[in-house]
Curated annotation (Swiss-Prot):
HAMAP family to which the protein is assigned, alphabetical: ATP_synth_b_bprime (MF_01398)
One term under GO cellular component: plasma membrane
Protein's recorded name: ATP synthase subunit b
Lineage: Bacteria, Bacillati, Bacillota, Bacillota incertae sedis, Caldicellulosiruptorales
Family: Belongs to the ATPase B chain family.
Keywords, ordered alphabetically: ATP synthesis, Cell membrane, CF(0), Hydrogen ion transport, Ion transport, Membrane, Transmembrane, Transmembrane helix, Transport
Record keyword Transmembrane helix present: yes
UniProt gene name: atpF
Subunit-level organization: F-type ATPases have 2 components, F(1) - the catalytic core - and F(0) - the membrane proton channel. F(1) has five subunits: alpha(3), beta(3), gamma(1), delta(1), epsilon(1). F(0) has three main subunits: a(1), b(2) and c(10-14). The alpha and beta chains form an alternating ring which encloses part of the gamma chain. F(1) is attached to F(0) by a central stalk formed by the gamma and epsilon chains, while a peripheral stalk is formed by the delta and b chains.
Intracellular or extracellular location(s): Cell membrane
Length: 163
């Protein structure tokens, strides 16, 4: 039935076959496979290193760009602030110039008004003198009493339109 001797013999030859195949594979294939695996492992490691380096550079660039961007925002804010300050200065200057111009106009108007007032006063004085001379000449012509002189002067003023 079952012969153990045959089984032991087959087992022996199987081990021998396995060792021979192992030596052949080792001689011809394992070195190539090991070299290929090492080469592949090295290439993968290089790619991982390159990816890590690229990631670090990307992070550095991102930080640089964020720094540049924040500086640009700060510069823009500074420019806006300076522009607002300058605009306020110009607005204040325009307002001050307008006030000065308005004061000059008012001053000129007051001078013109004063000149016109003096002119009117002189004209009234001249009219008053004319009226007084006219009244005096009429008083002298009639040489009446004081009451009559007063009435004559009042009549002359009424005729001249002076109240």
């Amino acid at each position: 039935m079952f012969d153990l001797a045959i089984f032991e013999n087959m087992f022996f030859w199987a081990i021998i076959n396995f060792l021979i195949l192992y030596l052949i594979y080792r001689k011809f294939f394992f070195k190539k496979v090991t070299a290929f695996m090492e080469k592949r492992s090295k290439m993968i490691q290089e790619q991982l290193d390159f990816a890590a380096k690229s990631k670090e550079e990307a992070i550095k660039l991102k930080e640089e760009y964020e720094n540049i961007l924040s500086q640009a925002h700060a510069k823009a804010n500074e420019i806006v602030q300076n522009a607002m300050i300058e605009a306020q200065k110009q607005a204040d200057k325009i307002i001050e110039d307008a006030k000065l111009e308005a004061n000059k106009i008012i001053e000129n108007a007051l001078k013109q008004l004063d000149i016109e007032k003096k002119k009117q006063i002189n004209e009234l004085k001249n009219q008053f003198v004319s009226i007084a001379l006219l009244a005096a000449s009429k008083v002298i012509e009639k040489n009446l009493n004081t009451e009559e002189n007063r009435k004559i002067v009042e009549n002359i003023f009424d005729e001249a339109g002076v109240a």
